[in-house]
Amino acid sequence: MSHLDDIPSTPGKFKMMDKSPFFLHRTRWQSSVAKLAFWSLVFFGLLFIFFYRSPISNPDSSRRSLRTYSWGGPAWEKRVRSSARVRTRNGVSVLVTGAAGFVGTHVSAALKRRGDGVLGLDNFNDYYDTSLKRSRQALLERSGVFIVEGDINDLSLLKKLFEVVPFTHVMHLAAQAGVRYAMENPGSYVHSNIAGFVNLLEVCKSANPQPAIVWASSSSVYGLNTKVPFSEKDRTDQPASLYAATKKAGEEIAHTYNHIYGLSLTGLRFFTVYGPWGRPDMAYFFFTRDILKGKAISIFEGANHGTVARDFTYIDDIVKGCLGALDTAEKSTGSGGKKRGAAQLRVFNLGNTSPVPVTDLVSILERLLKVKAKRNMMKLPRNGDVPFTHANISSAQREFGYKPSTDLQTGLKKFVRWYLGYYKQGGKKVAAAA
């Protein structure tokens, strides 16, 4: 029986047995209590619906990411310590947030291969296919990387991780990605990219010793900037999307924690990362899927039929940049939340320096897949996309020898080979691209 079943739908009638003022007062009081209880239940019911029931057409991933996770206990702590244990003399111990993500998986694997201690953290939200994230998790587990299932907004979990392991570095790659999705679910971007980042920095600044932090910003911070190539000193005060605005906010927040608490912080502005184990919401990925299925693909063009181009950067080059930034990151200067001196604060572009028209990307995919694409040319919508990106990487080259080496033709060939091997059609693996 529902707890509301004992509340009558109508007041009904009853016969007064006692006309005394005391009795009248008592019955009025009881009636008031009943009404109060009823409306309280209605009020809390509405609160429940509002906060815990999101519309089907607009799922709130920020709420989903706060679901209850199971962590803690001796066995769990043993796995955490084992994964984070340094295997080489000069190795470091790194907490990688967003470890089940595209870049996070590749970076975690690379760190582990060279003998560093690596512990992953990911909330496995369903912004895109979670089975792909689970496959990445299985891949990392085979190499000895344990991914803690939890959220960066869980302060207790973060504090526990730093109690169990004195991390020397944090590679912060957890974020709500995607430019267009921000128009559907803006709260998830504030929740993950701003609140989550602040939460992580709060724990890091109180740690003893404080870790050095390398984190993923984005090339989207350049927004409506028209000066090319994009350089780190160019203006970034014209974001074209909420996603870009949250990443720009992250850079300002990083400056604040560096200035007040002495945290060593390095931001990396990624330029259109692609490759095996990529994100299904990226154009090269869903173009491949739709071309194979015979579906039409929408290709955007700029004003007056202008070219839309991207500085596509292969994942292996991005990983080299991440490790280079990590290896040259200086120690934080604070301790227990108190600054002891000036700390390092940097930001770098990680791109390929060779913008390629999206139409050329489609042509390459057609050759690799041996399928002609059904092209649908469309005007670039005002949803946060920009007509071009182009990275100036001279700062990263100078600081840690960053030098991308994979052209788009080579990188897409590797991606297509992985895609055809990973996804099956009719229960059989599709033949690999030539």
Swiss-Prot record:
EC nos: 5.1.3.6
Chain sites annotated for binding NAD(+): 93-124
Signal peptide (residue range): none
Location in the cell: Golgi apparatus, Golgi stack membrane
Gene Ontology cellular-component terms listed: Golgi cisterna membrane
Membrane-spanning residues: 32-52, 91-111
Molecular function GO labels: UDP-glucuronate 4-epimerase activity
InterPro entries: Epimerase_deHydtase, NAD(P)-bd_dom_sf
Class of enzymatic activity (EC top level): isomerase
Swiss-Prot/TrEMBL catalytic activity: UDP-alpha-D-glucuronate = UDP-alpha-D-galacturonate
Bilayer topology term: Multi-pass membrane protein
Pfam families xrefs: Epimerase
Catalytic-site annotation from UniProt: 243
Keyword vocabulary terms for this entry: Carbohydrate metabolism, Golgi apparatus, Isomerase, Membrane, NAD, Transmembrane, Transmembrane helix
Domain of life (superkingdom): Eukaryota
Tissue-by-tissue expression: In roots, leaves, siliques, flowers, pollen and stems.
Coiled-coil regions listed in the entry: none
Free-text function comment from the UniProt entry: Involved in the synthesis of the negatively charged monosaccharide that forms the backbone of pectic cell wall components.
Sequence similarity: Belongs to the NAD(P)-dependent epimerase/dehydratase family.
Subunit structure: Homodimer.
Protein name (database record): UDP-glucuronate 4-epimerase 2
Organism of derivation: Arabidopsis thaliana (Mouse-ear cress)
